[in-house]
C-alpha cells in the first residue's frame, strides 16, 4: 500500500509539473556524442536494435531479458560515445516512461481484485449466450467490443480487462485462446486510433500539438502554427471515418488468417455454465466494480482536467485494495505482470538510448530530406505517404511511444520549414503510429500486455505467430488510411468534409452489399462479415497463375 501510495503521489507531482499530459517522459538528458564519432554511434545503435530483435524473434532468451540486455548494451554504448560523464542510475531511470508503468501497475492491481469476484467467468458465459456457440460470431462480438472500448478508454486498459475474459471463455469452449487474443489486440489498436485518449501516441500528439501547446513554443515560426493545432474533437472527426473504413477489411483479414481455428460451433449447456461460472463474491464485485466505474469516468475526464491517467489508475488500485480486503493484499498483487513492467522498462531505456545515440533522429532527418526533394505541387501528398508509412513501419519495430515522442518536434519543424499544412501531417503521423503498432508483438503497449497475461495463463504468444497475423492487417489498414488521407486532404482539400461523407457512404454501401451477399447464401449478418471473399480472390489468382503457366508450357 505504501509503495502504491507513494507512487501515486509521485505521479501526481510529475503529471502536474508537466501540465497533466500523459504518455511520455518530459525529462530530457543533455547528452552530446563525441565529435567525429556520430556515424559510428549511429551504426552501433542500429546493430544493438537488430540484435535485440534477433533474440526476441528466435526466442533464444525470454523477451524481458532481451530488452534488459539491449537496454544495458545501449547504455554502455551511450556512456562510451557521449562527451558527458558516465550516466548515473538516476539519469537512466529518467528514460523510463513512468506514466505508462503507473497506468499498467494500477490497472493490473484492479484487474487482479476483480478476477477474484468471478465477474470475468460470468462475462464469458454471457458472451457465449449472445453468440449461440458460433465461434466466428463470438469473435466478431469480442473484436467490436474491444474496438469500441479502446476508443473511449485506451487500448492498454481494454486489453487488461478483456484478456482474462477471453482466456476463460476459450477454456469453457475448448478453444486455443491465442487467435482470439490476437484478433482482439489488433482491433484494440485499430479502435484506439479513433480518439485522442484511445492510444498512447494519440494522447502524446493531442497534448503536444494542441493550439495552446504550439502557441507556447519559444520559436516564433513554430508558434505561428498554433491555429493548425488539433483538439479532442478533431481526432474523432478526422480519424474516425478512416477507422470505420478499416473495420470490415480487418474482420475479413482475421477470418482468412484464422479460418480454421475461428470457425465451427461449440455446444454447451448454458444452465450448467451459469451454475459453474457464476459470481463468487457479489459484495466484492459491487465495491470493486463501483471503484472501477469511477476510474473509467476519470479517464473520460482526462482531456478536461488533465489529471495523469497513471495517477487515476494508481489511486484506484490503492482505494480498491483498501475497500475490498485491507488485511490481504498478496493475492491481488500476484496478478501484477511484473515481467511485463520490467520489459517495458528495458524497452524504454533501449529506445531512448538509441535516440540519444542519434538513431531515431536520423530517421526523422531522412524523412524530412526525402519530402523536401519533391516539387511544391507533390510535396504534400509525398509528405503524407512518407510520414504515414515510415511511422507505421518504425512503430512496428520500435515501440510507438518513444517513436511518436521523437517525431512530434520533427513534424512541427518540417511543416514550418517546408510551408506544409500541419493538420494532414499530424493525422498521417497518428495513423501510422497507431496502426503500425499492429505490425509486431512489441509494436504497441497493448500487444505486450496481452502477451504477458496470456503467458501467465499458460498460453505464450510467440513473436512469429503474432507477426504472421499482425503485419498483414497492419499493411491493409495503413493502406486504407493512406487512401483516405490522400482523398480528403489532397484531392478534396477544398471540401474535405464532403469527401469524408462520400467515403463513409461508400463504406456503408459495401457493408450492406456484404450483408446481402452473405445472407443470400444463408449466413447471419455477423457471419457475412467473414464471408470468404478473400478466399475467392486468392483462388482466382491461383487459377490465373496455373492458366498462364499452362499457356507457357504449350
Mark where each language-model region is.
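Juxtamembrane and boundary regions of transmembrane helices in multi-pass small-molecule transporters
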Residues: 2-26, 175-178, 182, 193-197, ...
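Interfacial loop-to-helix junctions that mark the boundaries of transmembrane helices
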Residues: 32-41, 60, 64, 87-100, ...
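Structural signature of hydrophobic alpha-helical transmembrane segments
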Residues: 33-47, 96-109, 155-159, 242-244, ...
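Hydrophobic alpha-helical transmembrane segments
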Residues: 46, 68-69, 101-102, 136-144, ...
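Flexible hinge motifs at transmembrane-helix junctions and intramembrane kinks/re-entrant loops
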Residues: 52-69, 282, 286, 295-314, ...
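Transmembrane alpha-helix interface/packing and boundary motifs in multi-pass membrane proteins
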Residues: 54-61, 112, 145-154, 185-197, ...
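Membrane-embedded alpha-helical segments and adjacent helix-loop junctions characteristic
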Residues: 86-179, 339-340, 344-418, 422-423
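Hydrophobic alpha-helical transmembrane segments in multi-pass integral membrane proteins
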Residues: 195, 200, 294-300, 347-365, ...
